[in-house]
């Protein structure tokens, strides 16, 4: 449908002061589109990419564009040319989320209460355990790109600096931070990472590519940042590689629903849906774009629970 005149005016005002995107020469790529001709833009290579810069210079805005680049866009303001690996997942902390039978031992081990982290369960996850679960669940669904913003991450999941490692020894800390696994995730599992960071320089060491957003313009500062990082100690890495996470979760989820006299799926806006009395909170699933997606997810989950989760198929087989 054609936007109203008022909406169109607001849209034009928003674009009036926009800064035209300019790609650094080192990341410039060109390709020809059918009926469109040649276009040129920034291509971020596979590997570990760090996006840095001062506050309000466009770091998170660039990441948000990449998050939604998994979708096709209506032609208009240029977002239709933002293309991201379709398996890309936005990873963040989700305090309070539930976790069921998930192997987070790649990041969380030796909890003081003795709780099993190979098959971890909780109704109220912390920031670090929730982000660990989000990473492992993305691996389980064969994601090949993680998108992470420092602002929405659990600090203790992302990094432990050298001083903290000296004071709190490795065998006293149950969390293996993401920085110690990021290189392994790429080299062993083929999973790239794009991370927005504004305050922690430790990721300069493992990064393959470092882009600085300067007044909304991306600049390649990889060489400069790598040279500067030589004067600072690297984070120590675990001595042993961790076994592959276990992805054999099987659920028989339909029995209790089949006993219900009436089954109702209700969409509660873009951020939640309910099946009978159970509510699924999607506030922190940032790649959901509209309410219709949430409705589709609700019906897909209902069908899956009634017809596919038979206790024999693992979640990957169910999803396929």
Describe the residue ranges of each PLM region:
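Single conserved hydrophobic/aromatic residue that forms the stacking wall/gate
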Residues: 1-7, 11
